[in-house]
UniProtKB/Swiss-Prot annotation:
Disulfide-linked positions: 11-14
UniProt name for this protein: Thioredoxin
Gene3D superfamilies: Glutaredoxin
Lineage: Archaea, Methanobacteriati, Methanobacteriota, Methanomada group, Methanobacteria
Keyword Electron transport found: yes
Pfam family, one: Thioredoxin_3
GO terms for MF: protein-disulfide reductase activity
Active site per UniProt: 11 (nucleophile), 14 (nucleophile)
Family per similarity comment: Belongs to the glutaredoxin family.
InterPro entries: Thioredoxin-like_fold, Thioredoxin-like_sf, THIRX-like_proc
UniProt keyword annotations, A-Z: Disulfide bond, Electron transport, Redox-active center, Transport
Functional description taken from the UniProt entry: Does not function as a glutathione-disulfide oxidoreductase in the presence of glutathione and glutathione reductase. Has low thioredoxin activity in vitro.
Length: 77
């Protein structure tokens, strides 16, 4: 099972990134577990300098912007 981590404090951009990621996973039919990481120490430990962020299986893929559903689908496939 793929693990997708959404880094953010719950802001509108963070929520949009999560929505796009969930839609991408659904459209691709991927079995994935989502984890929201809101604690600033964990966000900094992951190496993020801007929010929101998205990691796949612990590897940071997106930082500081809201990726489109199509971009996320490319990352996941």
């Amino acid at each position: 099972m793929m693990k997708i981590q959404i880094y953010g404090t719950g802001c509108a951009n963070c929520q949009m990134l999560e929505k796009n990621a969930r839609e991408a996973v659904k459209e691709l039919g991927i079995d994935a577990e989502f984890e929201k990481i809101k604690e600033m120490d964990q966000i900094l430990e992951a190496g993020l300098t801007a929010l929101p962020g998205l990691a796949v299986d612990g590897e940071l893929k997106i930082m500081g912007r809201v990726a489109s559903k199509e971009e996320i689908k490319k990352i996941l496939s």
